[in-house]
A protein has these predicted regions:
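Glycine-rich, basic loop-to-helix element that forms the pyrophosphate-binding segment
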Residues: 65-81, 91
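Catalytic core of nucleotide-sugar-dependent glycosyltransferases
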Residues: 205-212, 219-235
Length: 235
């Protein structure tokens, strides 16, 4: 198994179908990658949507669990994954058509622990908004160590879905997402990336982030979230 796409799913029935379809519209044989849809105690009809796609696609695996939050869902998905590489995909977003083969080839050609992916944003009117021009992407073949990568690309945001990881790199080092924490992506990145020996920028848009109300990123506004943000950055 080459790749595992891990889709934590909670209350996203309006978006899940599009996300799964984007994961199916790929240039790898279905036998070479799996789509793990993890229903995290979702009260809507997400599980029915996932089952409908599973009927005709043997590479879709459905996991159901009591609601434990995004970090717990990602951890469960990681432990269930069989792929050599893993990609955490938010189930209200989508990935670019026919991007998996190039991602896999990049990971294997350079023997990477992590590959940073370029992405774009989509607003509620379905307009695509380029994030920014990444001047560092001119360095297509440069391999970074973890701390060097973080120092070189301080302007880059760290989201779980903006990286593809070698699964054994995460498992062997015991890297899991901390549960019950806002800004878990940032905390995860600041803890994981320094341990990576080989990281590379992949300067093709592979991911579309769906800007919407109701997501964690759009609703954080509490003292706890402020404290967690400082903690995530090591402050």
């Amino acid at each position: 198994m080459l790749l595992s796409l891990i889709l934590p799913t909670y209350n996203v029935e309006a978006y899940l179908g599009k996300c799964i379809e984007s994961c199916l519209n790929q240039d790898l044989p279905k036998s070479e990658y799996e789509i793990i849809v993890e229903i995290d105690g979702s009260p809507d009809h997400s599980i029915n949507i996932a089952k409908r796609y599973q009927e005709n696609n043997d590479n879709i695996k459905i996991i159901t669990r009591e609601n434990g939050g995004l970090s717990a869902a990602r951890n469960t998905g990681l432990k269930a994954a069989n792929g050599e590489y893993v990609w955490f995909v938010d189930s209200d977003d989508s990935i670019t058509e026919n991007c998996l083969k190039a991602i896999y080839e990049e990971m294997t050609q350079y023997n990477l622990d992590a590959l940073w992916l370029k992405w774009c944003n989509m607003n509620k009117f379905h307009n695509i908004i380029p994030l920014y021009d990444c001047t560092l992407c001119k360095e297509d073949d440069e391999i970074h160590e973890g701390l060097d990568f973080m120092c070189s690309v301080m302007g880059i945001y760290y989201f779980a879905w903006s990286f593809v990881f070698k699964r054994n790199f995460l498992i062997d080092n015991g890297f899991l997402f901390k549960e019950g924490l806002f800004y878990e992506d940032t905390e995860f990145a600041y803890r994981v990336l320094p341990a990576a020996k080989r990281i590379k920028l992949f300067c093709k848009v592979c991911y579309t982030y769906n800007i919407r109300q109701g997501s964690i990123a759009q609703t954080i506004s509490s003292k706890k979230s402020f404290s967690d943000k400082k903690r995530a950055r090591g402050c």
